[in-house]
Each structure stands twice: as C-alpha cells, then as structure tokens.
Amino acid sequence: DSLARRHIKHPAQFLFCNILRLYQLQGDHGTVIDRSINELKNNPDNWSLWTFLFDSTFASVKNIEEEAKKRLLDRVVERILSLVAEPLNKMLRGPYLARLTLIRKLVENDVLASSLLDTLKLHDPLEYLFEYIRLFYSKPCCYVDLKPFLFFIKDDQVDNFMQRVSDFITLLKEEHNQEKGKTTNVHWADIVYQRLQRGLGLHEKLSAVEKRRAVTYMVKMIDCCSDSDLAAAVYAHLAANLLWDLYADNGNADALYELILLLEWVIKNHPSDPISAIVLCKAYSSIGVTTQVQRFMRALDIKYIQRDTLGYLIYGLLEQYGRFSSAIIHYTELTAFFDQTEKEVSECLTTAYKNGSFLQVPRLVEFLNKISKSFIAVGVDIQTRALSACFAVDKVQLVVDTMYGDEEPIDFLGLEDNRDFGIIPSFDANKEQQRLNEMKQRTYHEQIDVFQCDAMKLSHLLMKSVAAVGRSKCTLKNLSIYLDELKKHVEHCRKTYKEDDSLPNLLQSPPPLYLSELINTPKMDLLMLLLKSASSVVECSESIISSNIIEHVHEEKLLHCLPNVAEVEELVIALAASNVATGALCFHVTLRHCSMVLQVLSFAQLIIKLLEMVLDNIFAFSLGQGTKKGSFSKNQRKNVVLNRLHEVRTLINKGVISINTQLSDVHKLLKSNDLIPEISNDYDEAVYIILLKEQVQVDSSIVASYTDSIMDMQKTVKRMLNQSQA
C-alpha cells in the first residue's frame, strides 16, 4: 500500500518482522513459515527471518503427525539447500549457519537423531563446520559463529578435525606470501585454529611449560599484527586465558604477574583493544591493586547503560582494600546515574503515551523495571549508606538516618541481574559456559540471593538494626523485628557459605565479596553481641519510662544489659589479630583483613555511641523525676554504667590501634624482594625481554596502589579514634 508506506516511518523489513511476531503470538505458525520461506529468497542473510522460521517450525512439529512433520522439514531443508547452492550466496553466512542451526535444533528437540540426517538430505555436521571455516575463515566472527556447534565434534573426532584445519592453513600459507607485520587472511585462519584449540579443550591437556610456549607463540603473532588491534586482541586474549589457567588452577602467582606484564605491553601497542583493558581490571582486582583498576575503568569507553551491566567489575572492590573515600565517591556517582536514568526513562514513557507510540511502551516499561530493580543499583545504594555512615558523616542523627534509609522495604527476591559477563568472551560453548553460568548464579546468590543469603541483605539488615537503636521513635518492637531478621539471615549465611567454600575462579568472575570471612569469624560475633546488649538496654529503657518509678533505675540492671568486658576483649583480640600474608602477590590479603576489621569496628563504635545516647535518655528521665534514692547519687549511678561502656569503647579503640600498628608494619614490607614474583624462564629471549620491559612500571604501580590503600586506612584510623573521643 503506497499510501501507508508514505505515512509509516519504519522500514519495511522492520514492519515485516513485527507482523511475523504478531502471527507467532496468535499461534498462526503456518503463515509465519510461508512468509519467512518466501522472504528468505530475497534476504537470505537476514537472521531474524531464519529465527522466525525455526521457531515456528519447531513449534509446529510438536503437534502434527509424522507425515506432515516430514513434509514441513523437507520444505525447510529445501529452502536452506537451495540458498546454499545459489552462487550469489557463496559469501553470505546466513544459509550456512541456518543449515547448522537446523541440525542442532533437530537433535536438541529430539526430532531426529544425528544418524538419520541423510533422510532429510543433510550430511555430517563436521563437514558443514569445516566448509564454513574454508569459506569464512577470514572473517573475525568465524569462530564466534561456530562456537554453538562445537558440541558436534566428539572427543574421538577432535584430533582428526583439528588436523584437517591445520592442513588447510598450511595450504593457505603456501599460497599466500605474508607481509611482515601485516595482518592477512592467513592470520585470521590461524586465529580460528587457535580458538578451536581453546574451545575444544586442548589447552587443558597442556603442562605449565607447554602453556607458556603457547603464550610465546601468541606474543610473536601479536607482533605480526601491528596493523590490526582486533587480531592482536584475539591473540592477547588467548594468551591471557592460558596464563589465567595456570593462576586459577595451580595458584601460580608468577603466571598472573606475567599476564599483567603481557597485557600492559599489548595495551601500549594496541590502545583501542578494550578486552585487554577489562582483563587487566580483573587481574589487578585479584591482587587488590585498586588504583590501576580505577585507571583502566576510567579509560574505557563505557557507554551510559554499561555503568550498570559492567558495574560488577568494581562493585565491592574499593572498600575491600581500604579505599573508603574513593568507594563513597564512586557509589555516589552511580547513585546519581541510576536516579537520572529512572527519571529520563519515566519521561520517555510519559511521552510515548502522549504521542500514541504504544509499541514503545512495553519495552520502556521493561527497561525501567530492569534499571530500577537492578541489583547493582540496590547494592550501590546500600554500600553508599554503609560507607557514608561509617566513614563520612559526623552528626549522630544524620548517621542514624543514613543507615536507616527509606521506609519502603527492599524486595530482594525481585531484583534484576543485568551483569554482562560476556564482555570478556568465553571460548568454550559447553564446559566453560556451564562453569560461567554456575558462577553467575552463585555470585548472584552471594550478593542478592534468592535464598535469602547475601552480602547486600546482610549489610542492609545490619544497618537497619543499628539505626533502630538510635532512632527518636525507637521501640523494642521495631528493633526486635530487624534484629530477629538479622539473626536468621546470619545463621542462614553460615550454613550456606562455609569457610572452605570457593567460587569458580573464572576470568569472567566478579570480584569476590568474601562473605564467609565476615560471617564465620569473630567479626560478626562482636556486632551481634553489641546489638543484643542494645536490645536489652532499649527494653530496660522502655520499662523504666513506662513505669514512671525511679527505683527501677539502678546500675545493676543496666550493667547486666551491657556487654561483658571480658567477652568483648576476647572477640576484639581475635578479629584484630595480625594476618600478615607472605609470598609473591599475597600482600592484598593483609590489606583486605585490615579493611574488613576497620569496617566492623566502625559499626561497633556506632553501636556504642547509640547505646550511650539511650543511657543518657534514661538518666535524663531519672533526673527529671526528682528525689535521690539510696547511697549513690544519680550521677554516680550514671558514672558506674557509663564507665562500663567506656571500657568497651576502649577495647574497640585498642582493636583500631592494633590495625594501625599492623598497617605501619606491613608498609615496611612493600620494599621486600618477595613481594613481586619473578618472570618464568620458560619463555624465549624475545618474549622474556618484552615482559621485562614492562616490569618496572608494573611493579611501581602495584606498590603505589598498596601504599594508597595503607595511607587511606591510616587516615580512617585517625578519624575513628578522634570520633570515639568526641
């Protein structure tokens, strides 16, 4: 309809796909199949059409008889094979990928066994895989296209298949004279081969020496790709995976150090490679080098919405290593971003309704839901409140309000996991992808957990419980609600996160939150002891004020409510005990210990300060009642009780001072020779020199970052001691 086309702004292909989608929603799969088959003759490389065709075909075969099923599948196969045979389509990937996709869907849906493919005029999928490599090896996407179909290659077929690919590349090399330093089609063919080795699990069989020899080869190939950042990035990514294997599987700190040296060299020579920068963020975060992580994150061209999807790369990291001020600034910026995004999407939604653009409404609503319920957004809000209350805000009432947050409860079960782990590509479509999915689910649980067991909820309930003690309308009922929830949550966490539990340490993994270190140690015990005392004091306060009888105010009852000094001392000594980790690239373990202890002791200080406020209110009420009673004056009674609280505060301050001493001691270790590992001798001379040239800069960056963490924590210690004395 020419009149309709004149007034409709959308392209015809877009409208055609929308029409097919509506037919599918209506269940009219026959029409979708007919129209898709007809349109594919004109647009064989349009993957949306293939998707519509396959979805409707396999929705139909479930409900039709065998003869009709055979006719339908024959029709689909005929369309695919006719397009493959068309000479004009030789360089179009769509029909070839459609052929492989059809076979995969036939097998996965148990429609046809792979041994019966010839009944549909289809052949061995391995032949189709090799044909695809032969036709499209020069395209950077070749391996990515093939990855979903690698499961067709059985274990006993891997060697023969790889030999065929190797022979093909050898022929290519003989046919083409490679220009030194230039990326050619032969390089891309070799990249397909190297990726296949990784994807088919051949790297797992290599020894440490063989893996470093493979890295040597990758480095030399990077040197041959001086004109292509993309080709160099692929080789660098392969090398990084090999070195990460050595580190993650064998705890080889040398390999992690070599990975950092290698990627620093790659980024200098190929600055437009974002993958190497992101992998470097992962490597540096693994050893607590936060300054470098921040530097690379700032340098990356992160798109607006990627601040959410890639937020996991730095979430929880800065405060983990004592960079509290930097963490507060980072989270405050992210909070502003999420608030602004919600506002803008809401405005777009309103505009869509006003303009009658109703097709846009469902997508905008979905997008708004994903942004507003993003677990990174919720986590950022919680961390901002926690860190600000502990290390930034001075006024007690403002601290209480900050920790308490909104009245509206957080729906932890309804949060959206928007994390994009695909930003660091995975080579293996099966085993590695399975581990990636396991890691995503487990880290999602650790941070926002469907089973009520996560670091976010723990922080949230802890803050609510602490804030409830100091609220002007504090009641035992309100405090008990949060405290009971916190107790249940802590117990559940202890059952779920054992001390010896470890997450899959994949290259794509987010920085671990070390939740088990918090809940399975005296750190959490100290806070629970203080909160239990706070609950008892609040109960005593309610009893005294409601009775209006001054005799109820006596030091024995209040002293019984306060924490036992000996018990507090034992817990503080245990949690602040020195944890100096020795060995190459282990320094960050000490920093993490000091940082976590400071966060716990800061919460402990806040609880003591709020307890003091409650006691002041009790004695203020007592003084307002009039007469003296007994041998002690009211002020003397008050002093007896507050002296106990002073003893507890002194013990907590001793813990803070102990951490300060540890920080001063470990600062001297930054000059130690065993802080940084040596480069392995398994590389040849050329590669060894490349890594050696990066050593001075990398070493100084690591030491500088650790120094920054120590200095930041020492400033925090000074503030905590000053606040305690105020």
Regions picked out by a protein language model, each given a short descriptive name:
Residues 259-266, 297:
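Active-site-adjacent structural elements in folded domains
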